Amino acid sequence: MIYSFSTARVVFGIGASVGVAAHAARMGRRCLLVTGSRPGRCDWLLEDLRSVMDDVRCVALVREPETAFISAQAEAARQAGSDVVVAIGGGSVIDAGKALAALAANGGDVFTYLEVVGQGRPFEHEPLPMVAVPTTAGTG
């Protein structure tokens, strides 16, 4: 039997977050930063990103992401020409970042791609590159 497993790069440890902006800048130049309900806690990252990116847009997720919010923010990211997503926060923020990366690269809204309750269309393009900076530990 032959198995193949490929995972994303995982960097962890004390001080690992210092390299986030430089890593993201190797993936793109126009960043969409997704944060939790208190974006001020991420000012250090916003400043780092602005020092190495051509443009940085910040989106704060104040509660569980709703489909209309994700669709609207993905369209705004597309219009802004965002080419990399950085998400810093808990599970909802990371999930929202993944959804935004996929939708910004493919167009349409959430229901275009949702199975069962939507059209269930497959993505035509790879999602935008994404850097996840989890700030909580959980089972998800």
PLM feature segments, named:
Residues 68-140:
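Glycine/threonine-rich beta-strand-loop-alpha-helix active-site module
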Residues 1-84:
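ATP/NTP phosphate-donor binding region
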